[in-house]
Amino acid sequence: MAKKITGYIKLQIPAGKANPSPPVGPALGQHGVNIMEFCKAFNAETQSLEAGMPIPVVITVYSDRSFTFVKKTPPAAFLLKKAAGIKSGSGKPNTQKVGKVTRKQLEEIVAMKKADLTAADIEAGVRTIAGSARAMGLTVEE
């Protein structure tokens, strides 16, 4: 018989830096999950990634207090900022541009995020990510 699911927890944790302090500890503690066990498992799975890269994770908690988790790809905004070499997006994206990204960079981001994007093909994914880039005040170069 399958285990009964008691809840889902969605968090965004820096790669290799999960620790019991907020926001991780309280979120897991509410559901009775062993916090250190999750932190060790998450850090082990993300040690190959760039340290500090935010990784969205969905934790499924079962009635016997066990858990499984699924890692997602880093947010598009983080990848765009990294590609453009900027610290943050523009406060006024329509008037104040803060950087540039090329189509090749967008294609690399789409290739990385392919599993989490709903786009039908690479071209649609590029358009989606290009829209995110423009919303952040980045200029998209063809």
Swiss-Prot record:
Pfam families: Ribosomal_L11 (PF00298), Ribosomal_L11_N (PF03946). InterPro entries: Ribosomal_uL11, Ribosomal_uL11_bac-typ, Ribosomal_uL11_C, Ribosomal_uL11_C_sf, Ribosomal_uL11_N, Ribosomal_uL11_N_sf. One of its GO terms (molecular function) is large ribosomal subunit rRNA binding. GO terms for cellular component: cytosolic large ribosomal subunit. One or more lysine residues are methylated. The keyword Transport does not apply. Keywords: Methylation, Ribonucleoprotein, Ribosomal protein, RNA-binding, rRNA-binding. GO terms for biological process: translation. It comes from the Bacteria. Belongs to the universal ribosomal protein uL11 family. HAMAP family: Ribosomal_uL11. Forms part of the ribosomal stalk which helps the ribosome interact with GTP-bound translation factors. Part of the ribosomal stalk of the 50S ribosomal subunit. Interacts with L10 and the large rRNA to form the base of the stalk. L10 forms an elongated spine to which L12 dimers bind in a sequential fashion forming a multimeric L10(L12)X complex. This is Large ribosomal subunit protein uL11.
